[in-house]
């Protein structure tokens, strides 16, 4: 993807030459006169790993580049800064919390090597969360500085297309900005999926968008799903001493080697993670104690069962953020896929997509 963009920006290849130039110029000129829009060689929508890499590469080629990034708060109100999923709600905080779990295991084993450590070892979620969140915020700032150093213009705006060369962005205060560019990259990533068929899922559940930004310990946690995100979260929650259960509909780590998947789940079980296999949740309700009562169906027995938890974490997959309002259009709905945008002609080579 980045290589294709570099080729497009380096020279007037036929493949990347717009085919509706005269019409586009007129549209852009009218919009500019009306709204005083800013123009760029490249506009990147999305400030995650792919978008930032693309923007920096183009800037190194001497192009005038802008990045438009906006984080739609999760249903629980969680939001974050520049850097995308990996920096804010993915790789970085996950690895830090995993490290906290590993340290706990080392401390528990230390007495075998002569260290006299009071047992049981207690973990303070607030202390860990504050350290993780402060580190993430430092990375947010670092990305801002890197863009500034490369003379990449950063806009904290929610983008929607006016036409294939023009984007309208609205900031959190409602102020609109018009941006135009020779090439536009869509790199808006994905957001966790909620099981909307499960009553109470949206009202009472959280996702990986929220777990790393909780101020208080999640307590006894039910993780629904068997993806790597589900097992990673369940693993570090168990590792820091929380009562953790994984509910999975079928097999763990679908798409991965199943012999290795079995070794992973067996290892987790040996360390205290519980698994509910062949189970699907049907509804959640909040009890007077503020705990969550989860009802599920056991496919093996055909019976219903219930359990009480402090937190329910959905980890059942992601949807492309472009399917939501993160990037919207005044024209008919579009999708990302083999045809990048359904509302644009296939012969248009000025729109590109990157990432998930």
Enumerate the predicted regions with their spans.
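Internal nucleotide-binding/catalytic subdomain
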Residues: 246-249, 262, 266-356
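A short acidic Gly-Thr/Ser loop motif
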Residues: 46-48, 189, 227, 317
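N-terminal Rossmann-like FAD-binding beta1-loop-alpha1 element of flavoenzymes
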Residues: 39-67, 230-239
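N-terminal mitochondrial targeting presequence
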Residues: 1-36
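Glycine-rich flavin
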Residues: 9-12, 21-23, 38-40, 57-63, ...
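Glycine-rich nucleotide phosphate-binding loop and flanking beta-alpha elements
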Residues: 51, 74, 191-193, 230, ...
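The Walker A (P-loop) glycine that initiates the GxxxxGKT/S ATP-binding motif of P-loop NTPases
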Residues: 45-46, 69, 78, 224-225
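Glycine-rich dinucleotide-binding loop and its adjacent helix/turn
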Residues: 91, 186-243, 247, 271-274, ...
């Amino acid at each position: 993807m980045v290589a294709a963009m570099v080729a497009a920006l380096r020279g007037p290849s036929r493949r990347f030459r717009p085919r509706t130039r005269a019409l586009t110029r007129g549209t852009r000129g009218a919009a500019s006169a009306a709204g005083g829009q800013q123009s760029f060689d490249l506009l990147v929508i999305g400030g995650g790993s792919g978008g930032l890499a693309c923007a920096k590469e183009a800037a190194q080629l001497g192009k005038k580049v802008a990045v438009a990034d906006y984080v739609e708060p999760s249903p629980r109100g969680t939001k974050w800064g520049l850097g995308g999923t990996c920096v804010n709600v993915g790789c970085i905080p996950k690895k830090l919390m995993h490290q906290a779990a590993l340290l706990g295991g080392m401390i528990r084993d230390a007495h075998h090597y002569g260290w006299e450590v009071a047992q049981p070892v207690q973990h303070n979620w607030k202390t860990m969360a504050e350290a993780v969140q402060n580190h993430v915020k430092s990375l947010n700032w670092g990305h801002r500085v890197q863009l500034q150093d490369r003379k990449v213009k950063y806009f904290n705006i929610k983008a929607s297309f006016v036409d294939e060369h023009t984007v309208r962005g609205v900031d959190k205060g409602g102020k609109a900005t018009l941006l135009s560019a020779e090439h536009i990259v869509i790199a808006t990533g994905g957001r966790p999926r909620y099981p909307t068929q499960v009553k109470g899922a949206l009202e009472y559940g959280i996702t990986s968008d929220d777990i790393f930004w909780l101020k208080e310990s999640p307590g006894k946690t039910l993780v629904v799903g068997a993806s790597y995100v589900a097992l990673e979260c369940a693993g570090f929650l168990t590792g820091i001493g929380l009562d953790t259960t994984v509910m999975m509909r079928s097999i763990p780590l679908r798409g991965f080697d199943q012999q290795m998947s079995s070794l992973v789940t067996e290892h987790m079980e040996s360390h205290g993670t519980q698994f509910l296999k062949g189970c699907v949740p049907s509804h959640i309700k909040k009890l007077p104690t503020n705990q969550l009562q989860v009802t599920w169906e056991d496919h093996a027995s055909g019976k219903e069962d219930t359990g009480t938890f402090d937190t329910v974490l959905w980890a059942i997959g992601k949807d492309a953020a472009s399917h939501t309002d993160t990037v919207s259009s005044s024209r008919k709905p579009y999708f990302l896929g083999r045809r990048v945008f359904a509302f644009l002609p296939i012969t248009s080579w000025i729109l590109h997509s990157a990432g998930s």
